[in-house]
């Protein structure tokens, strides 16, 4: 600057002053803010990178079903549904969730097991707990007085799952119900007949259907001295006798639900009884039960029921069991539950235990709870425990080494040569048009060995082979995959020959 004039020196000094001035407060704050954001983003990124790998799994109490499992499950469902249809039932489906207020009063002690949905549209909703309450709502909403229906669908219960025994939080139920005013015990007897047909058809082993009547249960409670305010909760405890010993149930009644010990002991005298029509007749003479008109009404219906069961040819599969209570509050009359007597994994060895595999009963007042005018539609029905049955069937198949085909393909269209995609497409379209289940590899030029291996692995019974020689001669080869035998037939008779072989197999 010594060579600059005074003015130029002052200008230069001012310029240097501007350049060397400390940053303003606003600038400092802005810079600090940007730095803070950058640091925070960096920390978040670091934290994200340090998180453990996400575990991919299904929610607790649920599961996926593989293609092999789906084949077994569908066969079980087909047998159950065909039985329902054989008895004249119509199919029905209802929403997977219902208005919460419609469900809460119907389950009482089981209310805490329901899955509630988050309120997003002004309606409080819950996933359905069973298929019975939605059916009753459907009858009331549509003012139906008579209906014989079946329904297959998933239900949800927030229980502790026991997956090793076929018990889940999400599971499938198959229900059959008869709604309407009919002469006593005829529909009830048919429901028990259906239960026997299904369990016999599935070949699960020996089974027993335990029956009782809620009026008999309430009568027992009354003559034993159970306060009316505790009837429902004590009945809920008694329903656990299939999972707990009488000592455990008694402890729950006394210690947790406040029942007097002497009252619990009097109940214990009754729950040991089980038998057939002779037990019903003996109970009529019981000096304690004879004091209850409600119990006598139930015993009268049970006596009539056993007569119909004898005519249906299933009386030997049914046993009156006074320990059976069925905890759901909507039951009003006959109740029943099917159990497998013993399903040995191997002769004389391990036993597969899954509890009850079917249950049901009469619920005459449920529809009236939905109907604005309180109109009664008596109902009786049953529910098949598909998951537990599936568990048993699956275990038996594992023990026997039985294999399952995951497809129903009957014919595979193949070629040993290149550039024969068009011919294969024409043939497979012809087979599909004839209703034949067929497939092919999605490649222009597949290797013949690859096609043969695919057929053998998938257990496809027949293979159609087309090549240049066959096309020129107007013929086609038909190969039996199992025996590896091949025959040459006229191209025009392909469909007829395949249909003939399939009908003979």
Curated annotation (Swiss-Prot):
Presence of keyword Aminoacyl-tRNA synthetase: yes
Keywords carried by this UniProt record: Acetylation, Aminoacyl-tRNA synthetase, ATP-binding, Ligase, Mitochondrion, Nucleotide-binding, Phosphoprotein, Protein biosynthesis, Transit peptide
GO BP, sorted A to Z: histidyl-tRNA aminoacylation
GO molecular function, a single term: identical protein binding
Catalysed reactions, as listed in the record: tRNA(His) + L-histidine + ATP = L-histidyl-tRNA(His) + AMP + diphosphate + H(+)
EC assignment: 6.1.1.21
Pfam families: HGTP_anticodon, tRNA-synt_His
Binding site for L-histidine: 130-132, 157, 173, 177, 326, 330-331
Sites bearing N6-acetyllysine, chain numbering: 443
FT transit peptide: 1-31
InterPro entries: aa-tRNA-synth_II, aa-tRNA-synth_II/BPL/LPL, Anticodon-bd, Anticodon-bd_dom_sf, His-tRNA-ligase, HisRS-like_core, HisRS/HisZ, HisRS_anticodon
GO CC field: mitochondrion
Residues annotated with Phosphoserine modification: 66
Domain of life per record: Eukaryota
Function: Mitochondrial aminoacyl-tRNA synthetase that catalyzes the ATP-dependent ligation of histidine to the 3'-end of its cognate tRNA, via the formation of an aminoacyl-adenylate intermediate (His-AMP).
Family: Belongs to the class-II aminoacyl-tRNA synthetase family.
Assembly description: Homodimer.
Protein name per UniProt: Histidine--tRNA ligase, mitochondrial
């Amino acid at each position: 600057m010594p060579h600059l004039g005074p003015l130029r020196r002052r200008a230069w000094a001012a310029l240097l002053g501007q350049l060397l001035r400390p940053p303003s407060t606003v600038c400092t704050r802005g810079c600090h803010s940007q730095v803070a954001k950058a640091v925070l983003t960096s920390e978040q990124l670091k934290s994200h990178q340090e998180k453990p790998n996400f575990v991919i799994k299904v929610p607790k109490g649920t599961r996926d079903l593989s293609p092999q499992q789906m084949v077994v499950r569908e066969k079980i469902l087909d047998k159950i549904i065909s039985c329902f249809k054989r008895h004249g039932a119509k199919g029905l489906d209802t929403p997977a969730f219902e208005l919460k207020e419609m469900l809460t009063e119907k389950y009482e002690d089981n209310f805490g097991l329901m899955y509630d949905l988050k309120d997003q549209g002004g309606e409080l909703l819950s996933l359905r707990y069973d298929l019975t309450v939605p059916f009753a709502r459907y009858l009331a909403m549509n003012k139906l007085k008579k209906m014989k229906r079946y329904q297959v669908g998933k239900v949800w219960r927030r229980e502790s799952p026991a997956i090793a025994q076929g018990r889940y939080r999400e599971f499938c139920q198959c229900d059959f119900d008869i709604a309407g005013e009919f002469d006593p015990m005829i529909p009830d007897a048919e429901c028990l007949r259906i239960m026997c047909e299904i369990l016999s058809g599935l070949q699960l082993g020996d089974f027993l259907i335990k029956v009782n009547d809620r009026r008999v249960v309430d009568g027992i409670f009354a003559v034993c001295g159970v306060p009316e305010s505790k009837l429902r909760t004590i009945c809920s405890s008694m329903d656990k006798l299939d999972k707990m010993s009488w000592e455990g149930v008694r402890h729950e009644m006394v210690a947790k639900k406040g029942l007097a010990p002497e009252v619990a002991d009097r109940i214990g005298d009754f729950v040991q009884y089980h038998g057939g029509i002779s037990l019903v007749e003996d109970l009529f003479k019981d000096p304690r039960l004879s004091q209850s008109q409600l119990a006598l009404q139930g015993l009268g219906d049970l006596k009539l029921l056993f007569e119909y069961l004898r005519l249906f040819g299933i009386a030997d599969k049914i046993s009156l069991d006074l320990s059976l209570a069925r905890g759901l509050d909507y039951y009003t009359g006959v109740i029943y539950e099917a159990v497998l007597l013993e399903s040995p994994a191997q002769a004389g060895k391990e036993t597969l235990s899954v509890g009850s595999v079917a249950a049901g009963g009469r619920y005459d007042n449920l529809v009236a709870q939905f109907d604005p005018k309180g109109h009664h539609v008596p109902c009786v029905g049953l529910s098949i425990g598909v998951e537990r049955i599936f568990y048993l069937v699956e275990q038996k198949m594992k023990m026997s080494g039985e294999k399952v085909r995951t497809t129903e393909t009957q014919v595979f269209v193949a070629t040993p040569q290149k550039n024969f995609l068009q011919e294969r497409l024409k043939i497979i379209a012809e087979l599909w048009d004839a209703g034949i289940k067929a497939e092919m590899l999605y490649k222009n030029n597949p290797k013949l060995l690859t096609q043969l291996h695919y057929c053998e692995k998938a257990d496809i019974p027949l293979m159609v082979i087309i090549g240049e020689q066959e096309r020129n001669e107007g013929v086609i080869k038909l190969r039996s995959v199992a025996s590896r035998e091949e025959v040459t037939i006229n191209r025009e008779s392909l469909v007829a020959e395949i249909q003939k072989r399939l009908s003979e197999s």
